[in-house]
């Protein structure tokens, strides 16, 4: 099975490397305006495959995306230190206007997996440009924020993060919503589990975890310029869900007819992901405060997309 990645920068190359380690694809094609960069990353990653799985990693052109089951869109300009994801919008929408038609010309049946920030608005841009059904344009959304939330809860509770079920919804960015009210550990409500574990969550603990999730990207960008390992692993996991028709539930971004009264907006909700992309949405139970926060997040994203005409 073939997977394409458009954009061979830090996120695109990290995704290709994660795919090689997972071994879910048989061929990964890197496409970039800088052909030497794509070739260098492809060659370097190919040399890792003897230690992992037999994956053919190569650089190519848009035409080489023919037959791809999924294409990751990681093309765009990098986020600057202190720059919000929404501030990237004007600079990256123009990139997609060139990229999306060329991808679909070569791979008209592919699921488009959007990684470029601000990812929720760029998902809406890609959806409008593509003319595809909403489910076939999937943004990485808050998968990484959700992973951070679960990891920090697990660290506090001293349990495996795989046993923590908690979501971050809405924008992948400043207005994201951490859903505390329905969080569970091993099927037990979070606060009940924390008490039984002797690791009660004080207001200070909650504030620390909230800050840890919400500000993680800014801290990483300040320290090393960009985030790529975490999101690369997350994108590879989404590709695996598509290629294997997994039907797992992930907090990915997709065009949504209505969210808390806000119409036609792309944002993250728990969604069932399979071979055709998003196959359904699982709307979680929310507290009144979380519902209002999700509505505000949806409005922010709606306004940003509307300003561009999308």
From Swiss-Prot:
Q: Tell me the superkingdom of the source.
A: Bacteria
Q: Fetch the Pfam families from UniProt.
A: Ldh_1_C, Ldh_1_N
For the ligand (NAD(+)), the binding residues are 11, 32, 62, 76-77, 115-117, 140
- Catalytic residues in the record: 172 (proton acceptor)
Could you name the Gene Ontology cellular component terms for this entry?
cytoplasm
Q: Where in the cell is it found?
A: Cytoplasm
Tell me which residues bear Phosphotyrosine. 218
Q: InterPro entries under this entry? A: L-lactate/malate_DH (IPR001557), L-lactate_DH (IPR011304), L-lactate_DH_AS (IPR018177), Lactate/malate_DH_C (IPR022383), Lactate/malate_DH_N (IPR001236), Lactate_DH/Glyco_Ohase_4_C (IPR015955), NAD(P)-bd_dom_sf (IPR036291)
Q: What is its EC number?
A: 1.1.1.27
The record's section on CDD domains has: LDH_2
What are the binding positions for substrate in this chain?
79, 85, 117-120, 145-148, 227
Q: Where does beta-D-fructose 1,6-bisphosphate bind?
A: 150, 165
Q: Name one GO biological process term.
A: lactate metabolic process
Q: Which residues cross the membrane?
A: none
* UniProt catalytic activity: (S)-lactate + NAD(+) = pyruvate + NADH + H(+)
| A molecular-function term among this protein's GO annotations | L-lactate dehydrogenase activity
Activity control, per UniProt = Allosterically activated by fructose 1,6-bisphosphate (FBP).
Q: Does the keyword Oxidoreductase apply?
A: yes
Involved pathway(s): Fermentation; pyruvate fermentation to lactate; (S)-lactate from pyruvate: step 1/1
Which keywords appear in this protein's UniProt record, sorted alphabetically?
A: Allosteric enzyme, Cytoplasm, NAD, Oxidoreductase, Phosphoprotein
NCBIfam families documented for this protein: L-LDH-NAD (TIGR01771)
Subunit organization: Homotetramer.
Functional summary from the UniProt entry? Catalyzes the conversion of lactate to pyruvate.
State the family it belongs to. Answer: Belongs to the LDH/MDH superfamily. LDH family.
**Could you tell me which PANTHER family the record lists for this protein?**
L-2-HYDROXYCARBOXYLATE DEHYDROGENASE (NAD(P)(+)), L-LACTATE DEHYDROGENASE
Q: What is this protein called?
A: L-lactate dehydrogenase
Q: Which organism is it from?
A: Thermus thermophilus (strain ATCC BAA-163 / DSM 7039 / HB27)
Q: Which gene encodes it?
A: ldh
